[in-house]
Amino acid sequence: MEAIKDFFGSLLLTELFKGMRLTGKYFFKRKMTLRYPTEKTPASPRFRGLHALRRYPNGEERCIACKLCEAVCPALAITIESDQREDGTRRTTRYDIDLTKCIFCGFCEESCPVDSIVETHIHEYHGEKRGDLYFTKDMLLAVGDRYEADIAQRRAEDAPYR
């Protein structure tokens, strides 16, 4: 009985019509695919992307070399070296982040008592060599200087939720 049913099913092309019905169902729906470089999905305001080091308005870097971010980093991606100044304060001489190790968890940003290290909204960066994804203190300060207005605005918007 099953063989006869299969014979008439294939003779009447029911499998073809079932497939065409499924194709037609999705053919007229709105497309979900975006053409990436020209079209982008909106990112969350809390998106964690490329790191940046911030400065105070007078131009002095915020980092006080407390090394909390280095201690809390689960991937051990942050390396900090510091020196004592003549006035008794500590400042970093070396602040490196290896983005090949970083898991973008945001613990460094949360642990910083002076809001020095932040994660920006930038997610489009690349490197041709492994060393290109190793960010030094000067590179992180340059990112912070370039996007300071945007960083300050996003942190002000997010302040009620902290």
From Swiss-Prot:
[4Fe-4S] cluster 1 binds at residues 63, 66, 69, 112. It comes from the Bacteria. GO terms for biological process: aerobic respiration. SUPFAM superfamilies: 4Fe-4S ferredoxins (SSF54862). Its EC number is 7.1.1.-. Its cofactor is [4Fe-4S] cluster. [4Fe-4S] cluster 2 binds at residues 73, 102, 105, 108. This is NADH-quinone oxidoreductase subunit I. It comes from Bordetella avium (strain 197N). The gene is nuoI.
